[in-house]
Every structure is written in C-alpha cells, then in structure tokens.
C-alpha cells in the first residue's frame, strides 16, 4: 500500500472536495508530491509541532466554542437554570466522548506507531476496526440511556424539579446524534496522522461554525429553547461526520474504510482498546466524578452553585482545549519517532509541548485570577449572588493551573508510546485517586473549621492538580532515565 503524499498548504483545504475535481488533475497533483508521513521522522521537531499542533489547537478551540455556545445562548437568552440543566447531563455525553477517545485515540496511536515501523499492511485494518467500534459502542450507550432516562436523571444525577425539564429535553435529543458525536472526532485523528492536520482542523471548524449558526435560529427564531440547542448540535455533528467520510472516499488519500476490515479481530481490537484505555478512563472518570461532584454540590448548596460550577467548566473548556490540541499534534510525532527508535526526537517533542502547555495555562491563570467577572459575564448577565459565587468558583478552581501541564502531557506521552498502564495511572491520579478523596473530605473539614462546606468542593481541584502533577513528573523522569540506560548499553 502507498500512502497519501504531502500537499502544499493551499491544496490541503481542497482535500474534502477532491471528488469534484477531474481525475487527471488529481493524478497530476498526487504525482508532484512526496510521502507526507516521511517528514515526521526527519523534519525539525519545532517545525513539526507548529505544523501539527497549530491546526489541532485551532480545531480544539473551535470545538470548545462548539461545546459552550449552547450555554452562552441559553444563559443569556433563556434562563440561567438552563445552563445547569445542560451541565448536569454532561456526564452522560462525556461517556460518549470517552468511547470516542477509547477507540479513536487508541487506534490512531497504533496507526502512527505502525507507520513509523513501516508496517503498512496493518494500517487500513486499524481504521476499519476503529469505524466498527465507533459505531458499536455508542449504540450500546444510547440504548441504555434511552431505556433508563428517568432513573439516570432522577436517581443517579439527583436532578431537581426546577432543572429536570431542561435536562430531559436536552439529553433526549442529543442522544439521537450520539453516534455521529463519537465517530466524527474519533475518525478525524486519522486525517491528522495521514499527514493533513489542516484538513483535520477544517472538519472541526465546519461542525462548529454550523452549530454557531444554527443555535440562535433553533433557540430563538424557532423558539425551541433547550431543545433547539440540542438539535443544532446533532445536525452539526452529522455534517462533520459527512466531511470525514468524504475525505477518505476521495482520491487525495490512498487510505480507505473497507468493509472487510470492519470484521472485528480480537487481537487487534484488544491492542486498540489497551492503548486507548488511558484517555478513555480519564474521560470516563471525569464523567463519574461529575455525577459525584454534582451530588455533593446539591448536598451542600443548591441549583445556584451547580450553575456556577457549570460556568466554571465552560471557562475550563476554553483553556484546556489548546492543551488537547497540542497533545493531538504531538501524538503522531511521538508515536512515529518512538516506533522508529528515535528517542532523542521523542524527548525533544515532549519538552517543547510541555513548555507550550505551561505557557497556555499560565495565560489562563492570569485571566481567571484577575478577570473572573469577565469570564462569568460571557454566560450570564446576573449581577447578584450567582455572579459572586461564580467568580469565587472560577478563582479557586483555577489556582493551580500553571502546574498541571505535566499531568496532562504525561498521560498523552505514555499513550503515544504505547504504554497504556502508565498512561491510565496518571489519568486516574487526577480524576479519581486524588480528586475523589479531596471532594469527599474537604467539605467536612471546612465545616469543622467554620467555613462554608461548598468551599471544600472548590479546593479539591487545585489540591488534586498539585498531587497528580508531582506523580506525573516522577513517571516521566523514570521513563527518560530508562532510555538513557538503554542507550548506554547499546554503546557498550
């Protein structure tokens, strides 16, 4: 099998529309270029990070807008409680996203490693398995959620009577398009690893722009409120999915989704799921923690505190998405060079990406600490107690921001080099091992010393950030030390 050749930047934007070009023109352009993936093992790391990460960052920022635009419109034009209604069902959607990450990132990491090893015979098999799994797993999740909708909302998530109408309306419609919500981002990873990060970015932009355009139309013009926000979201997800499929159906890439490769093989499926387990468990843990956290908030406060926390997570999404973009951009670089045993390039890639993430987080820290009111006002025009609580929530929860780059990049690093156990441990450290005990213990401690118990929920964030970043640093140091020992033995 031969792979997609490298294109000039201008041509990359035409990839999704290749089917409308004359065949002779397509063949001419293909013949003018060289193998796109070759440069991952030879070009300067800094240039590769820019080429791969910048489009991913833009795409993830657009994706952040994708995720929060509903809340902006609902908070400003419908009801602040509508934000809480959307926010409280996010753990369910995070499970769908976790499934997408389990398959998409796991398959893409294996895909990149196999490219570095020049094992081209396995590449399309990996893609075919990813497609089948991204359809199967979300379908199971949707079926379970539809059957047990009310018990999930009432008994597990403890949704109040005031929030229930918003939560039920939004979740029921969102589930209709959950398969596309999983498949579109899950398959987009392959476009990036095929050597076309800008095309991958374009797919995300198309979906986000569609959502931004449709949201006010469905919410206000059609007067559908929360239901309108949900319909706009699933339509935009479907359009993104169509664009992904159109790329892999064109002559601009030799990669194809073939039915024969969608017949699941236990061994290959196991490899995909093992590598993708770290990001999956992190996202799944976030979902479970979200349910627990909402229950604790409702226990010690009420719907207003839940709304404030949802606004904080919306702000968090905007700041964290660039880090996820950097992680996505570094993944094929680290995976390819690790497969090619170019460990020096892997270490340099990690160093540069870590410094970039620290810079982003430091900027986010400055904004959230010195302008929390601005962050809050994006989602609500409230000037009373909700605003004060929202500003306090944002300040405390982001107080350890500059140090969490090590934890986030550490999990991405071990996942990219095909070491899922270490990646899973680091992912669990922040979301479960350190956060849950803090979430349960600190409110009690704050109550004992005479402070509002809800403050304990907020301080659980920076404490778990600090502890997990420390653990990640230890893991990374040990891994790099092992590489030095291997290199020393090889010289002997």
PLM features: residue spans?
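Helix-loop interface residues and adjacent transmembrane-helix termini in multi-pass membrane transporters
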Residues: 68, 77-80, 114-117, 193-194, ...
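Small-residue-rich hydrophobic transmembrane alpha-helices
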Residues: 83-143, 181-200, 308-366, 370-372, ...
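Short alpha-helical transmembrane segments in multi-pass integral membrane proteins
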Residues: 3, 12-53, 111-177, 221-276, ...
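Short runs within selected transmembrane alpha-helices of multi-pass transporters and secretion channels
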Residues: 104, 174-192, 200-208, 229-242, ...
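Helix-terminus/linker motif at the lipid-water interface of multi-pass membrane proteins
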Residues: 61, 65-83, 153-161, 217-224, ...
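Residue-level signal for short hydrophobic patches within transmembrane helices
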Residues: 42, 46-65, 69, 92-99, ...
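Interfacial/gating helices of multi-pass transporter permease domains
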Residues: 74-94, 161-166, 226-229, 268-275, ...
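Transmembrane helical elements of multi-pass membrane transporters/channels
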Residues: 51-70, 173, 184, 207, ...
């Amino acid at each position: 099998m031969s792979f997609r050749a490298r294109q000039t930047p201008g041509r990359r934007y035409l990839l999704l529309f290749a089917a409308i070009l004359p065949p002779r023109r397509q063949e001419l352009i293909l013949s003018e270029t060289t193998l796109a993936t070759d440069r991952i093992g030879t070009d300067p790391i800094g240039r590769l990070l820019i080429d791969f990460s910048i489009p991913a960052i833009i795409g993830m920022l657009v994706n952040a807008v994708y995720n929060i635009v509903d809340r902006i419109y609902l908070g400003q034009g419908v009801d602040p409680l509508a934000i809480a209604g959307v926010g409280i069902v996010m753990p369910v959607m995070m499970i769908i996203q976790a499934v997408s990450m389990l398959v998409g990132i796991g398959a893409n990491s294996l895909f990149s490693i196999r490219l570095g090893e020049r094992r081209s015979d396995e590449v399309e098999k990996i893609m075919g398995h990813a497609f089948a799994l991204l359809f199967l797993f979300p379908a199971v999740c949707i079926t379970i959620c539809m059957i047990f909708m009310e018990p999930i909302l009432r008994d597990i998530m403890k949704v109040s009577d005031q929030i229930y109408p918003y939560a039920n309306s939004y979740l029921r419609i969102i589930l209709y398009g959950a398969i596309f919500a999983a498949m579109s981002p899950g398959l987009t990873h392959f476009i990036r690893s095929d050597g076309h990060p800008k095309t991958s970015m374009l797919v995300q932009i198309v979906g986000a722009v569609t959502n931004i355009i449709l949201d006010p139309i469905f919410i206000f013009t059609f007067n559908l409120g929360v239901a309108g926000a949900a319909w706009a979201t699933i339509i935009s997800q479907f359009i993104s999915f169509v664009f992904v499929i159109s790329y892999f159906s064109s002559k601009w890439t030799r990669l194809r989704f073939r039915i024969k490769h969608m017949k699941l093989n236990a061994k290959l499926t196991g490899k995909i799921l093992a590598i993708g387990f770290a990001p999956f468990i992190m996202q799944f843990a976030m979902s479970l923690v979200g349910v627990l956290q909402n229950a604790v908030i409702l226990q010690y406060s009420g719907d207003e505190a839940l709304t404030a926390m949802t606004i904080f997570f919306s702000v968090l999404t905007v700041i964290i998405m660039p880090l996820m973009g950097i992680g996505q951009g570094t993944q094929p670089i680290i995976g390819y060079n690790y497969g090619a045993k170019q460990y020096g390039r892997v270490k340099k890639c990690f160093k540069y990406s870590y410094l970039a993430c620290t810079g982003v987080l430091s900027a986010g820290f400055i904004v959230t600490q010195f302008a929390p009111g601005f962050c809050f006002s994006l989602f609500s025009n409230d000037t009373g107690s909700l605003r004060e609580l929202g500003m306090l929530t944002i300040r405390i929860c982001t107080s350890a921001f500059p140090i969490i780059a090590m934890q986030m990049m550490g999990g991405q690093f071990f996942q990219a080099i095909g070491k899922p156990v270490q990646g899973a441990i680091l992912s669990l450290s922040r979301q479960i091992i350190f956060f849950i005990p803090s979430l349960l213990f600190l409110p009690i401690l704050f109550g004992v010393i005479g402070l509002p118990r809800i403050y304990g929920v907020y301080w659980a964030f920076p404490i778990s950030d600090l502890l997990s970043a420390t653990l990640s640093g230890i893991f990374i140091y040990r891994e790099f030390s092992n590489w030095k020992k291997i290199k020393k033995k090889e010289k002997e």
